[in-house]
């Protein structure tokens, strides 16, 4: 614990808490100040000036990062017949129907993404209390309720991320790993930022992005200059 505290202090000394950095500077600092003993995840956290209580100001969706996330997702698909075969060919880790529902109800959760064809949602709905709180429930807005299961599986395996604004207007997302080249992290950030900017509700007033930080697992939050975006 003492060693970790020392590493944290060393990281804090390299970051000016009163300064907002450019994206390039923030990414470089995130890599430099990372002290985790593993390949830490790099994340962005936005605070948006939106009122999620209003239906037209709820932000939720999915996108594929140009350089991936550095993580291999375990994909579960609820489908039957030809669609089940398509999912298997596309590389889904688990494909099934009632058998998977029973397994999940028994406590099994060794997967990262859940995809379902529309006709399977009545069955999947039984898992709402399990999947919902973990943000694993299939949803058309994130492309996880679809007839094109092959595309959904391939995207999930190829760097697809989902995002959703919470009650306070906060949106968090993974943009890669510390082991990524800085340029690739910046590219991923810019792609995600473009998505967030395009998602701005027409009825949102004032400054849209009020705060933005980049951080690593166990790392220190580095403030990004929103005016430089």
Curated annotation (Swiss-Prot):
Task: List UniProt keywords, sorted A-Z.
Answer: Repressor, Ribonucleoprotein, Ribosomal protein, RNA-binding, rRNA-binding, Translation regulation, tRNA-binding
The record ties this protein, via InterPro entries, to:
Ribosom_uL1_bac-type, Ribosomal_uL1, Ribosomal_uL1-like, Ribosomal_uL1/biogenesis, Ribosomal_uL1_3-a/b-sand, Ribosomal_uL1_CS
Q: Which GO terms describe its cellular component?
A: large ribosomal subunit
Checking Pfam families in the record gives:
Ribosomal_L1 (PF00687)
Superkingdom of origin:
Bacteria
Q: Which GO terms describe its molecular function?
A: rRNA binding; structural constituent of ribosome; tRNA binding
Q: In Gene Ontology terms, what is a biological process of this protein? A: regulation of translation
Key word Phosphoprotein present in the record? no
**SUPFAM superfamilies for this protein:** Ribosomal protein L1
Ubl conjugation: is it a keyword of this entry? no
Quaternary organization: Part of the 50S ribosomal subunit.
Role, per record: Binds directly to 23S rRNA. The L1 stalk is quite mobile in the ribosome, and is involved in E site tRNA release.
Which family is this sequence assigned to? Belongs to the universal ribosomal protein uL1 family.
The record's annotation in PANTHER family points to: 54S RIBOSOMAL PROTEIN L1, MITOCHONDRIAL, LARGE RIBOSOMAL SUBUNIT PROTEIN UL1M
* Protein name as annotated: Large ribosomal subunit protein uL1
Q: Which organism is it from?
A: Streptococcus pneumoniae (strain JJA)
Q: Which gene holds the coding sequence for this protein?
A: rplA
């Amino acid at each position: 614990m003492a060693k970790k505290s020392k590493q944290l202090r060393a990281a804090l000394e390299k970051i000016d808490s009163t300064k907002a950095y450019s994206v390039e500077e923030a990414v470089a600092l995130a890599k430099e100040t990372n002290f985790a003993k593993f390949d830490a995840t790099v994340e962005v956290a936005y605070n948006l000036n939106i009122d999620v209580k209003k239906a037209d100001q709820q932000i939720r969706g999915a996108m594929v990062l140009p350089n991936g996330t550095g993580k291999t997702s375990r994909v579960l698909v609820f489908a039957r017949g030809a669609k089940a075969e398509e999912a298997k060919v596309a590389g889904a880790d688990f494909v099934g129907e009632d058998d998977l529902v029973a397994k999940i109800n028994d406590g099994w959760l060794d997967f990262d993404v859940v995809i379902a064809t529309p006709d399977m949602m009545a069955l999947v709905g039984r898992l709402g209390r399990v999947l919902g709180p973990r943000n694993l429930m299939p949803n058309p807005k994130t492309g996880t309720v679809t007839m094109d299961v092959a595309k959904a599986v391939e995207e999930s395996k190829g760097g697809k991320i989902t995002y959703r604004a919470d009650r306070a207007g906060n949106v968090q997302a993974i943009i890669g790993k510390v082991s990524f080249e800085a340029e690739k992290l910046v590219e991923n950030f810019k792609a995600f930022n473009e998505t967030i900017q395009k998602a701005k509700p027409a009825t949102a007033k004032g400054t849209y992005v009020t705060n933005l930080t980049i951080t690593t697992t166990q790392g220190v939050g580095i403030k990004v200059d929103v005016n430089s975006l």
